[in-house]
Amino acid sequence: MAAAPPLAAGLRPAMAAAQAPVVAAAWGVGARRGAALSSSARCRALRLSRGGGGGRDGWVPPPVVGRMPPRTLSVRCAASNGRITQQEFTEMAWQSIVSSPEVAKESKHQIVETEHLMKSLLEQRNGLARRIFSKAGVDNTRLLDATEKFIQRQPKVLGEDPGSMLGRDLEALIQRARDFKKEYGDSFVSVEHLVLGFAEDKRFGRQLFKDFQITVQSLKTAIESIRGKQNVIDQDPEGKYEALDKYGKDLTAMARQGKLDPVIGRDDEIRRCIQILSRRTKNNPVLIGEPGVGKTAIAEGLAQRIVQGDVPQALTNRRLIALDMGALIAGAKYRGEFEDRLKAVLKEVTDSDGQTILFIDEIHTVVGAGATNGAMDAGNLLKPMLGRGELRCIGATTLDEYRKYIEKDPALERRFQQVYVDQPSVEDTISILRGLRERYELHHGVRISDSALVAAALLSDRYISGRFLPDKAIDLVDESAAKLKMEITSKPTALDEIDRAVIKLEMERLSLTNDTDKASRDRLSRIEAELSLLKEKQKDLTEQWEREKSVMTKIQSIKEEIDRVNVEIQQAEREYDLNRAAELKYGSLNALQRQLQTTEKELDEYQSSGKSMLREEVTQDDIAEIVSRWTGIPVSKLKQSDREKLLYLEEELHKRVVGQDPAVKAVSEAIQRSRAGLSDPNRPIASFMFMGPTGVGKTELAKALAAFMFNTEEAVVRIDMSEYMEKHSVSRLIGAPPGYVGYEEGGQLTEAVRRRPYSIILFDEIEKAHGDVFNVFLQILDDGRVTDSQGRKVSFTNSIIIMTSNVGSQFILNMDEEGGSTDSAYENIKKRVMDAARSVFRPEFMNRIDEYIVFKPLEREQINSIVKLQLARVQKRIADRKIKLEVSPGAVEFLGSLGYDPNYGARPVKRVIQQYVENELAKGILRGDFKDEDSILVDTQVTVPSNGQLPQQKLVFHKMSEESAPAAAEDEKFLPAV
């Protein structure tokens, strides 16, 4: 038997090695941070087996004659490069190395090789390797698939601990990565060094790069574009690469792609920004204005001008990057991590040699950002660069936040130059809306009429307070278009009703199918005939709806194509590719526009025929409806002409307010003057003082006015001035001052008007309030606004202010002694009442009220009318039980005589009806005398006492039969309560 050939020098069989301490410990993801990778990192493993199972790394001994084939032997040797430790790698590179054994284990491989490292690198989320390959023009998904296919082709090991040994090729790759680290002058081995190491990997990397046409030069170019001029000086450099791309948004790139909305107007503000940016130092404008006036739009307008070349030489071909402070702060777990990110951003900006301009929206968030546990905040990091002119930065913030944050830091404030952005006028807003119309039409797939744009600007300015143009007008147009789009895509009402009817008849037909009687068969035949008609109509309507929808969809797709062609034309003109621009403009664009005109004409003809089920144009009625939903104003008030509605105001008020003709007339005329546009738009709609004795209808007139103007009595904000008798109680109206309890809650008056700006404000018993309370009313009545305790301006320009007072009521009650109720007597009494008011209220307060209205005391006949009104309310309360109340004229007269008291007005009537009518009705219902759907007659009855006293009159309640009820209602003797 021949002797076995000797093993290669320096190698020991695994059986012999088993006698010595094992040095190849398993290593994997669970390796301790900071510790050596494992002892096996100092060794490389060779698998010796017959048949070439070890691949390139295996050494196959020659066959031995007359002996059994040798078993597979694991042979180890010491690596010459020492230990692999975490300290020499960046965190991302170390993570990929540590997770490689796990990849090998999943694939049932004992030796960790370069292909496992490649898969680990490509599977890192937001990993640097993926970014490098993407920059080099390689599809990462295809690269990962090729790697996995190579791994699957490798032989698998069963029964042993897989993934426990470091392969020779992987060790060589790590050594090459160390060499690239020295070449780049870095302090740590990073992911890019590992990626470059694959280029010389004979096992796997070289062939992979050849298949995907990846060269070392293309990789180095990609790495340089990502790294810039940075060196790896810490263990997290990957987070600082492309910091601007990661934490910012390139507005100039978006402008080139046509993704920014057009900016209309604002030329002065943009020119001022350009002027400040062109300075040598402190070249940092900050845009200050109210929220919604268009500060961010100015930065976008500047980006568009840079792209178009409409800027001075100092700003030509510059990049405008919008910094995302949220992304910058998010995920910064460790102390100093946020500062590292911000420094990386600032370094990229300064390294660009003025080619990059930073835009920080909501710049007040920079002050104090990241300043936790003694760390330096972002504002202090910006200051040196801002002052020296190394960093050009545009900021944007609101007036309040600028004062609260920026002005508190004078060193930061002086580095910024203020550019105030005012709210545009209504005319400018209409121009802005016209410029944006095409974008919103394209997005929603509807048309927006010019009248809708004008209505959006006018109605938002008039009715939506607390927000600013053009933002609130744009929101109106956007929401109206979205509502119309939703209606187009939803099933039309006519079709939906037919669908429901078909389902109902189908269910009825199924239930009648098994019935054999003649009536059921007749009903079944009628249902089938009706179903056939309905289904035919359903089919026609569905086809019509689908046809209209398809035409609208086609129009939208043509518009999108036109928009894309326009962007391409602009890009071609910027690149001076005039042939391409002319070809697009006079070829593709013309063809698309002709196609659009033809399709729109087809749709218009169809809609004008009256058969259309869909509406595809936003009108001013749609805008008005959205305004009503935002503010609570009834939509009919805006859509219906005020002239038509207000002409009947006096008649409507008289349905609820009995008598008081001068008061009702004065209120109606004041409202008509206001709505006709003859009153001051900077003052309340109207302000009245109702003076008169108690119970004559002062508060009722206010409620009736609210029900007519706003369709609900809830629109009355009632404030009882007897609660404001102390001097300090004025703070309850407009809010407590800072430092006092209730400061955050706001005032009772100001909060009510802010929540519901269109209401009637009723100050009841005004003379009972403290004199200092009237000082608040001066600016409300004169300027239509008041500033609350938190500095917010509350507008009263759309409110009706009514004050009631009992001053001089003694003169009104003595009116009969003065000569009855003639006009001359009324004027005389009114003069006396006004004199009494002047003795109570100060002249500057009285001079601001639009009209003083003196209420007359109620007469006996008017009390009867009030009795009928109160009985109608009783009938309303029992209407849900379907009980009808019939009241005779005698009963009305009886109740009126009991409720008449000149000193107390109409209030006793309510008590009388409660005592004589409601109580008796309640007892009758509880006894069972009156049941649901009964008709009850209320009449009077005279009783003669037997003791010789005078006859007495009382109310009696009779249950009427079904036959007598209609006759009694028609008889003149009886009056229905309603």
Curated annotation (Swiss-Prot):
Annotated GO MF terms: ATP binding; ATP hydrolysis activity
Annotated organism of origin = Oryza sativa subsp. japonica
Outline what the protein does.
Molecular chaperone that may play a role in chloroplast development.
Gene induction: By heat and oxidative stresses.
What Gene3D superfamilies does the record tag this protein with?
Answer: 1.10.8.60, Clp, N-terminal domain, P-loop containing nucleotide triphosphate hydrolases
CDD domains the record matches = AAA, RecA-like_ClpB_Hsp104-like
The segments labelled I in the record are: 244-492
User: What is the designated name of this protein?
Assistant: Chaperone protein ClpB2, chloroplastic
A biological process (GO) of this protein is: protein refolding
State the InterPro entries in the record: AAA+_ATPase, ATPase_AAA_core, Chaperonin_ClpB, Clp_ATPase_C, Clp_N_dom_sf, Clp_R_dom, ClpA/B, ClpA/B_CS1
Is the Transmembrane helix keyword given for this protein? no
Q: Cellular component GO terms, alphabetically? A: chloroplast; cytoplasm
Residues of the transit peptide: 1-76
Q: Which NCBIfam families match?
A: chaperone_ClpB
UniProt superkingdom: Eukaryota
Region listing for Repeat 1, in residue ranges: 89-154
Protein residues bound to ATP: 289-296, 692-699
Which key words are in the record? ATP-binding, Chaperone, Chloroplast, Nucleotide-binding, Plastid, Repeat, Transit peptide
